[in-house]
């Protein structure tokens, strides 16, 4: 059964045609009976009201479909840079991906981002060059672009027949046939025909290149070529599949999803070339009991092991937990063990999702993706398994939020509801956070960009019907230190007639930018009943110190912004069994941290953004001056046929309103993407 399953993602730059391609896949595999278009807000995978309004994909919708006895789980991911977290968590659980590229734009900035994310998770992929019917479409230029940008071997298994207005089909280099689609049946009917004489020389040239690439890793094909024999189609497919799994080269297909050309061969390629769940590298897990790493093969007979990769709120069912199963089997009604949180939870129901519709399942097993209902404490990145064999899968890393707005309820009665909704939204989206400002008492929400914040506040106001006022966007700064400092703190207070005492020494030191925070301890732990000896604490007191320091990281040093790139080392403690309490150690640690950091030359860090501007050549000078006026530094430029791409870095604080200014400076012809790059000391 596993070899008949594919878990794939559709990934690309915004507007390359991912959702349209997915719609066509669902239509031709019989999952939907009418093609929905993004432009008229009818796309099946874009089911949120805002997605239909904006014509972009925000959340990664999951759906299951079937093709030639194969089950294909498809995740359609957003291309907009503000929703990178959605792409990240999808790629984490996929076995293969289809990279959709625009035949005109080629490799665009967000293509690079998702490509590198896929590289990080070692996801095998195939490429589909879409929009071959557009003016300026150039399949061969896209091949060159991918090869140069990513340094990968590219190998077309098809070439287009014509381009732009004259695009009419593709030549299949494996079967050496032309494929033409019937427009009257919305491309459902298509036929293979002999290659026209005027196109034969080009087809033979590219087939020879394809066989050269394949034969470099296949003695069998080399032998057949040397003997002048025909190379069977099945052997070619087998060798391509092997190479895709090893990521030796990337097969390229082409078409126009909107014009219903080229989609069925793409689905064939998913089945023929992308891996089954048991063909990718086994999942790496950690056994916290034995403190050892191990590989978990994907098989239904093993102990149950799954990863929660997404949480979605449903007003009737509560939390929908999207789970990828790596081993074993979980049935409806089973108890599962959340390894990280060390808690048991019951799976009330299991669902197979189709965008925002669902069907009930009795069980889910290794390799599959499903939705669990009934889990109360599980969050994105949590591992579910069995208590007898606790294993932890590697969690997911998400970027830090860089932009904030204040929200306040319109009435006191809305206050609790607002907090409840913010908790739901931050559980759904790990790059969205909310906190209370310690000085003003205001609620501050933070996200990845203006669009991200706009989408979330609209969900809060429209979907959850919360009555609240939303402030103007502000930059989310960070605090850090620049020198090392050691500090000792004694705490002594009588509370309720009982002495509370603690004494500890902390060293704080700066870390490299981008390292995050960490807490380390030289202090040993012992059981309460044992004797501590020197420089040792009971486990609950050491936990209290750690908890206190983590709280300090969130609340900042001078201004109240979260800290970053600080290491705190617990150097030594004094322990008196009669007066030591968790409260005393928490208070001592917090005061010690504040004093040490205040003396360690604290600094304010601001987020710096990577900005990519796509501009027609005649406006590129105006576009560049817009970014330099904002204190931006131009790092490099790429030139394409009629477009230049400017790569720059600029402080987030100066980028508000950039979209409007860029549009007016370039008569609305330039566009840009912006993503977080790094924090640096505020200029």
Swiss-Prot record:
Gene3D superfamilies: 3.30.230.10, 3.30.70.240, Elongation Factor G (Translational Gtpase), domain 3 (3.30.70.870), P-loop containing nucleotide triphosphate hydrolases (3.40.50.300), Translation factors (2.40.30.10). The keyword Nucleotide-binding applies. GO terms for molecular function: GTP binding; GTPase activity; translation elongation factor activity. GO terms for cellular component: cytoplasm. InterPro entries: EFG_II, EFG_III, EFG_III/V, EFG_V, EFG_V-like, EFTu-like_2, G_TR_CS, P-loop_NTPase. PANTHER family: RIBOSOME-RELEASING FACTOR 2, MITOCHONDRIAL, TRANSLATION ELONGATION FACTOR G-RELATED. This is Elongation factor G 1. The lineage of its organism: Bacteria, Pseudomonadati, Spirochaetota, Spirochaetia, Spirochaetales.
